[in-house]
Amino acid sequence: MRKHQVFAMDTCFHNSIVGTYPYDVRCEMLVELGFDAIYVSLQTDGLHHVDRMAATKNQYGLEVVAAYAGLDVIAAKDDPKNHEVSELFQRLPYGCDLELTLITSDQSVKPSSIDIDHLAIERLKPLLEVAEKQQAHVCLYPHFGAWLERVEDGIRLCENMEHPALKLVFCGFHWYAVEGSNLSQSISSAIPYLHSVNICGSSREGDIAGCTIEPLDSGDMDNFSLLGCLHRCGYTGRIGFQGYGIGGDVYTNLQRSMNAFRSMEKRLSIHPNWSGLI
């Protein structure tokens, strides 16, 4: 059975009582629960611990696998927010990927519109230069409501640019909220570029994009079939847990998700034919 590198997104570490959990506490929890890696958001106030991030592998045995950011593809080349993304990317530990949602400040541009593909390509090129120097990747992150909203949008850009450092993220929640059907086709089409996956429990009629974000052992979305499809298509990369807005007892929620994930892995190892359910 293939063993994925497992991480938790930093969205898992926030609730209404504590706010955002301290970096060192996050690391301690992840190690105790059997995670392999940590994941951060790429923003100035979220990188005040950048020096500690560089020491994370030695201190905790955790990889800093990726950082999340948004990039406005309509903004001018010298846009300060876009420039900040590039600057912060360069401060990350070597090998730490940038997972990037492509947005637009022009509300007249519809999600997935191919009319601004050329602008997206233009904005991505300098970040790919940084990725090469950092020995890392830029991974396109489909996100509900963003210009890059669908898996197929990321595939289109990867195919057009043909850059070895440009990859794709499959976000279970955002796929469920935006598309929610033809999962096998989405995965198989993405596989040539797929470098990262994040998953969570989810049900319809929630407050976020019409769906909920929950620990992995709850909700209506069939994450076992998703994991089976990934294995059938040969995906061996990292898999993480999304936790935006869950709140509550962070440790318990992560423990539930990890237990559910390991249970699904075990089922697939015992019944490999079950990977063909969809």
Regions found by a protein language model. Give the residues of each.
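Active-site acidic/histidine proton-transfer and metal-coordination neighborhood
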Residues: 78-168, 177, 252
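Non-catalytic positions within long, well-ordered alpha-helices that form the structural scaffold/packing
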Residues: 31, 58, 90-93, 132, ...
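Histidine-acidic metal/acid-base catalytic patches
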Residues: 1-11, 15-31, 121-125, 129, ...
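Active-site-proximal loop/turn and secondary-structure-junction residues that shape catalytic pockets
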Residues: 13, 44-46, 70-73, 102-108, ...
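Catalytic domains of carbohydrate-active enzymes, especially glycoside hydrolases
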Residues: 22-46, 94-96
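Glycine-rich, proline-tolerant flexible connector loops at the mouths of alpha/beta enzymes
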Residues: 39-59
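Conserved beta-strand positions in the central sheet of alpha/beta enzyme cores
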Residues: 39, 66, 97-99, 139, ...
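Active-site mouth loops of central-metabolism enzymes
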Residues: 7-22, 70-80, 109-117, 215
